[in-house]
């Protein structure tokens, strides 16, 4: 790894504890998790106890009040160990900020401590069978009926969807208003009418549960609306840059790990009486 000055000694101490935790609690089991299609639920509560979830959440809501670099450390160590099934970052760095930034005080106190502890696993339901990167095209609707919103629609390719206890649902509260008709809602998994479809098989990241979600006349209190009705698209645009950053951090860490594993292999693998790393063509390829 290229030496960096970005992280303090405290960050590096945290890194050591994260790596130790993952090597004990995740690495030995990841192969089995890939077969079953999701990680064991107890890993979440153990990670919460270890301070690895939502470390940036303020202390008043149960977090450590730490900076984003602590999240970056967790993402990097997961990537370097090849633990592609662990969806901590989506939970901590994507879902939690929506609640922190746009949720009422009541919602923050109700949910954030449970996210920090790992009692609740979270997901965000944006993608639909007919709407992916075009979030203005979502068809899921939320209609106000008295003191409740009634949600109908379906979502797909939802990371953490199978284990999720709480989901942020992107829905249209005014289908005719375009981007200004989109809103965000918190929906608990045991809400009547909310069901989970099959876990989707993927080419890679097989231990990361990815599911379909269905909403049929799902009623949620209007207090579960995040922020203002119709402002959901703006909130998504505000928060998505951090999501992209977490993907970049994880991708770079995984690439560094892949290079390191390749170097180790080429030094150990012998051909024609010497390590294949000593062959000129191998060196050219590794240099590239």
Features from the language model and the residues they span:
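A short core secondary-structure module
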Residues: 147-148, 152-197
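Glycine-rich beta->alpha junctions and the first turn(s) of the following alpha-helix
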Residues: 3-10, 14, 194-288
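Short Gly/Pro-enriched turn/cap motifs at secondary-structure boundaries
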Residues: 88, 115, 130-133, 157-160, ...
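Structural signature of FAD isoalloxazine-binding scaffolds in flavoprotein oxidoreductases
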Residues: 65-77, 134-138, 188, 214, ...
């Amino acid at each position: 790894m290229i030496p960096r000055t970005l992280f303090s000694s405290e960050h590096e101490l945290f890194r050591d504890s994260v790596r130790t935790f993952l090597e004990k609690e995740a690495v030995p089991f990841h192969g089995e998790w890939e077969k079953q299609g999701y990680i064991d639920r107890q890993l979440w509560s153990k990670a919460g106890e270890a301070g690895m979830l939502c470390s940036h959440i303020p202390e008043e809501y149960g977090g450590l009040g730490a900076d984003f670099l602590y999240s970056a450390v967790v993402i990097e160590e997961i990537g370097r160990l090849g633990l592609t099934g662990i969806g901590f970052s989506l939970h901590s760095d994507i879902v939690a900020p929506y609640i922190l930034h746009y949720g009422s005080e009541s919602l923050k106190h109700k949910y954030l401590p449970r996210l920090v502890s790992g009692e609740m696993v979270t997901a965000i339901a944006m993608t639909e069978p007919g709407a992916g990167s075009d979030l203005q095209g979502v068809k899921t609707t939320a209609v106000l009926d008295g003191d409740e919103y009634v949600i109908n629609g379906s979502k797909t390719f939802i990371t953490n969807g199978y284990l999720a206890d709480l989901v942020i649902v992107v829905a249209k509260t005014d289908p005719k208003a375009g981007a200004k008709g989109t809103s965000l809602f918190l929906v608990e998994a045991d809400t009547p009418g909310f069901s989970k479809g099959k876990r989707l098989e993927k080419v890679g990241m097989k231990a990361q549960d990815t599911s379909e979600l269905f909403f049929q006349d799902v009623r949620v209190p209007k207090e579960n609306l995040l922020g203002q009705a119709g402002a959901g698209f703006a909130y998504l645009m505000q928060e998505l840059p951090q999501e992209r950053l977490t993907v970049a951090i994880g991708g770079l860490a995984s690439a560094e790990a892949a290079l390191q594993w390749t170097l180790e292999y080429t030094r150990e693998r012998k051909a024609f009486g010497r390590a294949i790393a000593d062959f000129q063509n191998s060196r050219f390829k590794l240099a590239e």
